[in-house]
């Protein structure tokens, strides 16, 4: 399929629909794309195009996800929708589709259901910063008091998982009516209200290049007469010749200065997020740096060994384990570019974890890794992926 030229004139924001099965996530996704395409241009997408989600792989895990794009007057949105509950769990944990904000779809006829709760918890655990609520199927509920009751329940649920329930925008409408072009308050106008909430409630995310410099170490070379060159892809920020950096993870943190930046064998004065570069480090020996460490702006990221995480364990069909694992299971944790062994502590009420489950765990690594909340990792056994996770909270 030919890729059209990407016009990046507006700020770009990543969003997605979450919520209980059959509450109307896919219908709403189709309605947003269709209604906004009429008003602001872009491609209308039908329900069938979105429901038929293509398979993709993230960290060795197969996930079905639909990607839709739409625009408002001020922004360009990339929106992800998943057909099944398991796909949501995998998507959110692997970060296959990082969300700057989520649209929680809740049926006014049913109120919050088990997956409504689970998706809010997942959003909290994996670091989705903002949630907007679309109260769907309002055309099926005549009773204003019932609508207010459902709205109150949703706000309480958001509060329970540390989202600001009282301040969360809740838009009432009917995705089905909107998709059919209905002009009543619950139809197309509800979608435009939702778009306005997206524009105003979710702040424009910081671009990778504006962050504090971070580059995972992929390879280390010794170049005679010049010193040690470390290669990798800059994850965020900018690095300029002459700047001081830290080498963090696995062993004690070291400070050094970047004396050269090269890309494709050409010398540059700086490297930035997305660039594959080689950095020449002053006075650093080849054996002082190894894969799995990171180079970073001094003080911007610290090494840690002890944290809680939300993980998804691959099923047997996905190439995962065939048997459950128990407390004190010791796999490898693959962070960025390397494996580190660690032990897993299960929640008190969980005796074991079955393939295909998702679970909150506590991990202790044998070596420290440069870590922040929201960092993704894979769980591996002898080089094959058996799970995926995200750091929820750092303990030490």
Swiss-Prot record:
Gene: tuf2
The species this protein was found in: Acidovorax sp. (strain JS42)
Region annotation (G2) ranges: 60-64
Protein name: Elongation factor Tu 2
Region: G5, residue numbers: 174-176
Entry EC no(s): 3.6.5.3
GO MF, one example: translation elongation factor activity
UniProt subcellular location: Cytoplasm
Job of this protein: GTP hydrolase that promotes the GTP-dependent binding of aminoacyl-tRNA to the A-site of ribosomes during protein biosynthesis.
